[in-house]
């Protein structure tokens, strides 16, 4: 079992999700701490005690790092009790278990998708109650879109906001996206009400946008790719970065200058 990102140097190469998570951590982007358990590692009471000591929580979010193809892929991102009875049955031969700090995706303040190209970054966002996966899978149109040049223009007097291009979903489009999100959540077994969503979309506050532009600058300088996406969220007033993708899927490794 490896505790990440602290033990990054011990991770075997070629683990797509883990590679991109560690790349973002290396660049100073905030990520959840996590633990990686191989498919052939026994999960025992001592394992659970070590995890409880590390996470200091009673629950974890479980994701899966596939190490071989599977005809029955398992959907990750769900929360489980950090107990032997809950975690041990999740282990299977096709995946490594990837346990992260718990997050309630229904309480996300924003889901953010960053599309990097050679000369610009397109920031797509959805609001409270939505998830960045809604954007990545094309299930929901963005509620707010911001385009910035690369490198980010700051201006002579730090008037960076003047150089951004903004667009927003209409109120009708926003309400329709709530209907679609509720349909998706119902199909996943969640029971939710419209109260988890804002009646109107609230644009990203300018101070958070300024922080995000700082991360964008850092990523654009150091990730050696021409066209890629970065997924992030804001939860409990904090940024969390998830992974990096290219248009043809996640790469095995990403070069860092």
Language-model features: locations:
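Nucleotide/phosphate-binding sheet-loop regions of phosphoryl- and nucleotidyl-transfer enzymes
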Residues: 1-257
């Amino acid at each position: 079992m490896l505790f990440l990102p602290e033990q990054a140097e011990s991770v075997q190469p070629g683990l797509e999700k883990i590679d991109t998570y560690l790349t973002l951590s290396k660049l100073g982007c905030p990520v959840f701490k996590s633990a990686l358990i191989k498919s052939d590692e026994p999960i025992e009471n001592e394992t659970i005690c070590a995890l409880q000591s590390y996470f200091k929580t009673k629950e974890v979010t479980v994701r899966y790092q596939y190490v071989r193809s599977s005809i029955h892929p398992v959907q990750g991102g769900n929360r489980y009790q950090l107990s032997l009875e809950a975690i041990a049955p999740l282990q299977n031969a096709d995946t490594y278990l990837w346990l992260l700090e718990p997050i309630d995706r229904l309480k996300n303040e924003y889901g953010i998708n960053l599309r990097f190209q050679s000369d610009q970054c397109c920031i797509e966002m959805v609001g409270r109650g939505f998830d960045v996966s809604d954007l990545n899978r094309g299930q929901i149109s963005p509620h707010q879109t911001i385009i910035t040049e690369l490198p980010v223009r700051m201006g002579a007097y730090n008037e960076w906001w003047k150089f951004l291009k903004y667009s927003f979903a209409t109120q009708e489009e926003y309400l329709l996206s709530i209907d679609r999100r509720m349909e998706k959540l119902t199909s996943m077994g969640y029971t939710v009400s419209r109260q988890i969503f804002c009646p109107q979309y609230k644009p990203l506050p300018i101070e958070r946008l300024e922080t995000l532009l700082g991360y964008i600058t850092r990523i654009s300088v150091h990730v050696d790719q021409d066209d890629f996406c970065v997924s992030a969220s804001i939860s409990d007033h904090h940024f969390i970065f998830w992974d990096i993708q290219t248009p043809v899927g996640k790469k095995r490794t990403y070069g860092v200058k």
